[in-house]
Regions:
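Short catalytic helix/loop segments, enriched in acidic residues and glycine
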Residues: 1-4
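Short glycine/proline-enriched coil/turn segments at helix->beta-strand junctions
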Residues: 16-20, 52-55, 73-78, 90-93
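Asp-based, Mg2+/Mn2+-dependent phosphohydrolase catalytic module
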Residues: 78, 83-108
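Short catalytic/ligand-binding loop motif for oxyanion handling, primarily in non-cytosolic enzymes
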Residues: 21-23, 29-34, 67-70, 86-89, ...
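A short, structured active-site edge motif that brings together acidic residues
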Residues: 24-28, 40-69
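Conserved Lys-Pro-Asp/Glu-containing loop-to-beta segment of HAD-superfamily phosphomonoesterases
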Residues: 58-85, 90
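Substrate-recognition element of Asp-dependent hydrolases with the DxDx(T/V) motif
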Residues: 7-40, 47
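Generic hydrophobic alpha-helical segments
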Residues: 10-11, 68, 72, 100-107
Length: 108
């Protein structure tokens, strides 16, 4: 489990020194349009509730399987993702989400 307050602090610290902060998340596999709309709304509400102090440069909620590097503004940026395939295909540095706080703390 990630400490959302700590995550928010680290994201804001990095944004203050010039990092662009974004989210790219998949919808569920095979979801219908109306269901996907509800899931998108729920994911955005979750971000606002749990790390609402972060000002996102971009948020993309996309169909399952969409190559994440193809829908973001900075495909050579840093990705945290639990899917190994997404990490392998990413054009920049990619990490598992397990140590996100520690990795962010090490960034300047």
């Amino acid at each position: 489990l990630v400490d959302m307050r700590a995550l928010g602090r680290e994201l804001n610290r990095l944004a203050a020194v010039g990092y662009k902060i974004g989210v790219v998340s998949w919808l569920c596999k095979g979801g219908q349009a109306d269901y996907n709309e509800r899931v998108t709304k729920t994911k955005i509400e979750w971000l606002r509730k749990h790390i609402g102090a972060v000002e996102w440069n971009e948020i993309h909620i996309v169909e399952y399987g969409t190559p994440k590097q193809k829908v973001v503004d900075f495909p050579d940026g840093i990705l945290f993702d639990d899917e190994i395939g997404n990490r392998k295909n990413w054009l920049g540095n990619a990490f598992d989400v397990d140590n996100i706080i520690e990795i962010l703390k090490g960034m300047e």
